[in-house]
Amino acid sequence: MPRSLKKGPFVDDHLLKKVDAQNERREKRVIKTWSRRSTIVPEMIGHTIAVHNGKQHVPVFINEQMIGHKLGEFSPTRTYRGHGADKNAKGSKKK
């Protein structure tokens, strides 16, 4: 169920303060955050935000198409290594 429009988008205060401070100083430095739940708002356009995926911070460059999405959507937490391959299928064939 989506969030009510009258409430507005959720953005952690500490993240929004960092973005606003960089906008005032006209800086574009990487901002580290653990807040995967924050919604991307127009003030973040052009910034690179390093979103934590549980192991490391993944840099995400924010553009116009990302507005309204969550930061966690762009930092995958699981790695897919493929299904187990048959041991005999790669090398030699069975006789």
Swiss-Prot record:
Pfam families, sorted: Ribosomal_S19
Region Disordered: start-end pairs: 73-95
Gene3D superfamilies per the UniProt record, alphabetical: 30s Ribosomal Protein S19, Chain A
Keyword annotations of the record: Ribonucleoprotein, Ribosomal protein, RNA-binding, rRNA-binding
A molecular function GO annotation: rRNA binding
GO cellular component, one term: small ribosomal subunit
Function: Protein S19 forms a complex with S13 that binds strongly to the 16S ribosomal RNA.
Stored PANTHER family: RIBOSOMAL PROTEIN S19P FAMILY MEMBER, SMALL RIBOSOMAL SUBUNIT PROTEIN US19M
Family from the record: Belongs to the universal ribosomal protein uS19 family.
Protein name, as recorded: Small ribosomal subunit protein uS19
Gene expressing this chain: rpsS
